[in-house]
């Protein structure tokens, strides 16, 4: 490999690293909402999996504790899935054209 090619690759890698950092900052600002129980339990979190809010409809507070715990877990899992999908969609534009193996997730 020639010096010019190596320098070009290094510059390209540095640019991608800067872009990844910017994307991580953007993902920290994007919020998704997971729901369960037809919207009676809601979890709002960022695409970096930081939970911002948990909302439980007051009608559930008198109900079975185990059921409420299951609904909270389901809403949380729904939010995590939505955050993953959103993150993958945002990152796919950055990784377009890169020869990454199937299932390879960014950021590492």
UniProtKB/Swiss-Prot annotation:
The keyword RNA-binding does not apply. It holds the Pfam family YbaB_DNA_bd. GO terms for cellular component: bacterial nucleoid; cytosol. It is found in: Cytoplasm, Nucleoid. SUPFAM superfamilies: YbaB-like. One of its GO terms (molecular function) is DNA binding. Binds to DNA and alters its conformation. May be involved in regulation of gene expression, nucleoid organization and DNA protection. Belongs to the YbaB/EbfC family. PANTHER family: NUCLEOID-ASSOCIATED PROTEIN YBAB. Homodimer. This is Nucleoid-associated protein BTH_I2220.
């Amino acid at each position: 490999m020639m010096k010019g090619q190596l320098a070009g690759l290094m510059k390209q890698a540095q640019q991608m690293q800067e872009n990844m950092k910017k994307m991580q900052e953007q993902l920290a600002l994007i919020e998704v909402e997971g729901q369960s129980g037809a919207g009676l339990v809601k979890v709002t979190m960022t695409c970096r999996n930081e939970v911002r809010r948990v909302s439980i409809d007051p009608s559930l507070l008198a109900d079975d504790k185990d059921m409420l715990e299951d609904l909270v877990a389901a809403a949380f899992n729904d939010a995590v899935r939505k955050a993953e999908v959103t993150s993958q969609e945002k990152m796919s534009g950055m990784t377009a054209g890169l020869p990454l193996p199937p299932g390879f997730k960014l950021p590492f």
